[in-house]
């Protein structure tokens, strides 16, 4: 266990909610980067920022083709970093994609991407986690409400809320095919969940959130206070969101699949220590221990 | 089995798609009723008509209170017309609500409601089915794609597509809480589904569509051709839709429950005969045999 003060206790006997102890924006107004001052303010307030077109159509085609190549590569399929859906035997996610694929590594180093992360986190950044997600339609389940930070803190040992994620759409997100939902402003409250972390929890939690799931009462309070925003947008659009946003997604009964690349940047001044509420670290391809700044 | 010509074969060995053999609008331009000519045309084209406010806030309060009274009445709970969700033991639907509750009976007789049905179907109408639906949040599942007519024809013996449904919202339908989705224009093609009707299929099909479910291939073709429209709207809004619209709903992971009253009007010139593709009739509270015109 970590001896640093645990600002965000979780996975204890009872659910407990505490105000955020960290800023949302760690940079200063003159921290360089592509995000406008107005957008920074709305990110600070809501906890997210929707970018209608982060990458162009030709780049979407490039990354989508690379995604298809990876998920059809037997070597990638055999790699423990690939998450295969039992029934269909189809790949749902490939982790550490920035290490497996040079094309996705370039995307991580792209100033439109890493530049925004540095600007928000006010420092150099490294990749805490990256993955490509391939979510089919025809009833594929969504992902229930959770805060990523609650898991990254409890199971990966990230001390502070100085982490930001970006989900870049490689297919269109309609209002019908189970897109990302966020409760705007929920990032300003930390919800410590009840229930100890089971051993090897990560194996299950990649398919379905269980440990670290808010109670119905908490969800009702959050939703009544904050409402819920659904993110739609064309392929190439992106959603930046603070590590402590309460988010989830519904199932997708449409025939329209959803693919995206998901990158988590963490400040080099917030590197992972030992898990705050879990018996063991998660594997490095899920919670990085390589803190090399993105260059 | 019925000896009338079966215009819409289904539940055979293979899935088969045939063009609609019936008009969508059975009235003539001078058939009286509240729907404008332009709205009638859009209903003919899309197969549905969204009415932003069919009933007022005070009426919503009245009907919502009546819904709450019914689902908390032990006698209603014990009635076979109530569908109780096994795990939570909560009532999900109450059928034949227009017979159980005089308040809902008045709604059925309301000219804003039955007047629209007569106008669309070009004749007197009776209630083929009515129910109140109470769909909680927190992950309650939706209802997969299906055409109601496919079931009403196969299992209730409705000969022709001369039936219209209205879903009147008693709570707000957001873009996040698993609202009704329809493929606009899908009503102009009948999709006969593969697979015989199991005995007592209705007991299962009230919770989850199984017999009468389109294949992935068919859904992909329909969705590519027609797209998918999600219906949102405040409490008091309503969606009228043709009996052969391909429709479904996703799950609801939000805390916001969805309640509605669902009424199916059938033309008195299209009364039920014997099922076209099922061994036995469904119970009368699901597929009426009382053809008394609504007055």
From Swiss-Prot, chains A, B:
2-oxoglutarate binds at residue 135. Keywords: Dioxygenase, Iron, Metal-binding, Oxidoreductase. The keyword Repeat does not apply. Its EC number is 1.14.11.55. L-ectoine binds at residue 129. Signal peptide: none annotated. Belongs to the PhyH family. EctD subfamily. Involved in the biosynthesis of 5-hydroxyectoine, called compatible solute, which helps organisms to survive extreme osmotic stress by acting as a highly soluble organic osmolyte. Catalyzes the 2-oxoglutarate-dependent selective hydroxylation of L-ectoine to yield (4S,5S)-5-hydroxyectoine. Homodimer. This is Ectoine dioxygenase. It comes from Streptomyces avermitilis (strain ATCC 31267 / DSM 46492 / JCM 5070 / NBRC 14893 / NCIMB 12804 / NRRL 8165 / MA-4680). The gene is ectD.
